[in-house]
A protein has these predicted regions:
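Surface-exposed polar/charged interaction patches
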Residues: 18-21, 40, 199, 251-254, ...
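Long, highly charged low-complexity segments enriched in Glu/Asp and Lys/Arg with interspersed Ser/Thr
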Residues: 100, 105-111, 218-287, 291
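OB-fold ssDNA-binding interfaces and closely related basic DNA-contact patches used
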Residues: 1-168, 282-284, 288-291
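Extended serine/threonine-enriched, polar tracts that run as long, contiguous segments within proteins
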Residues: 148-234
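Non-transmembrane, interaction-prone segments in cytosolic or luminal domains
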Residues: 70-71, 76, 173-191, 246-260, ...
Length: 291
């Protein structure tokens, strides 16, 4: 691996860079084998007996967290996560192929990031856009569709976990990845991480308690994560945590290798097509010889 995947809790500055915490402290300048945390957008209904009558109830409430374990979806309204590291990327949903355009994952978003479509930043222009109103409508729409994403990797415990029928389940210290792409959720995680940074504490040394809050948009209801950094209890970093940290680092590198491979193939193809179009645009001109 290109980076030393060892947690040194006595070297905050170096570890803050490696784990991605420096992004918040400084102000925000392939198929996954990891379980993914998602938010349940709609309630899951079920039947329950109330006063001798069968009534429809919300077995799983909207806004609950969901993760897949052993082929089964598990839900909880509250979770406790231990963040080993975070990375940042851009992503955009491509409805034409029902898939995502994704960039490589980086320690921050201050540089142009190659994406798996052979471009950069999923099509977002480089640098700060000073006059958004001056852009074309198509460019505005493109930029709005691109999500700034905080990729969180760590372990999670689901509090009072159940399945979709309300049966008790157990998720304790389970490795996960979570792509937080809502604006408020992105900011909330940053605030919690910055709280650790202000106390010169690595995120892996503490838990975060996470719930969700409902938000309303035009004709739409959605949910955002609310994070609370728990500085009251310090967690030990032992050999098992070191091994898991190395696995997370390797997972990020695997994602980046895949994106770079896709970029290389599609960028070369794009360049070839552009050269062909340029060549075809030339018009042969007959030059008369002067006697």
């Amino acid at each position: 691996m290109s980076e030393l995947a060892v947690i040194d809790s006595n070297n905050y500055a170096a570890m803050a860079q490696m784990t991605g915490m420096a992004y918040d402290a400084e102000g925000g300048k392939n198929k996954s084998t990891l379980a993914r945390i998602k938010l349940q957008k709609k309630p899951i209904k079920g039947k329950a007996e109330v006063n001798g009558k069968n009534v429809t109830v919300d077995v799983v409430t909207a806004g609950s967290f969901m993760i897949e374990k052993d082929g089964k979806n598990v839900y909880a309204e509250n979770i406790k996560i231990r963040m080993f590291l975070q990375r940042f990327m851009y992503q955009k949903y491509d409805s034409t192929v029902n898939n995502y355009v994704k960039t490589v994952m980086a320690n921050d978003l201050d540089i142009d990031l190659k994406d798996n479509y052979g471009g950069f930043n999923c099509g977002k222009p480089s640098g700060y856009i000073q006059d958004f109103a001056a852009l074309t409508d198509s460019m505005k729409e493109l930029i709005r569709s691109i999500r700034r994403t905080r990729v969180v990797l760590g372990t999670v415990t689901f509090v009072d976990a159940t399945d979709e029928k309300g049966n008790t389940e157990e998720v304790v210290d389970m490795p996960f990845v979570w792509e937080v792409d809502s604006k408020e959720g992105f900011r909330n995680f940053g605030e919690a991480t910055n709280k650790f940074a202000k106390h010169q504490r690595l995120s892996v040394m503490h838990n975060m308690n996470v719930t969700t809050a409902e938000r309303e948009a035009v004709g739409n209801t959605y949910y955002v994560p609310i994070c609370e950094a728990d500085l009251g209890t310090t967690l030990e970093v032992n050999e098992s945590e070191q091994a898991l940290f190395a696995d997370f680092m390797a997972w990020v590198e695997s994602h980046n290798r895949w994106v770079l491979s896709e970029w290389e193939q599609k960028h070369v193809k794009k360049a070839s097509e552009e050269e062909k179009e340029l060549a075809e645009s030339f018009v042969d001109i007959d030059v008369e010889e002067v006697e």
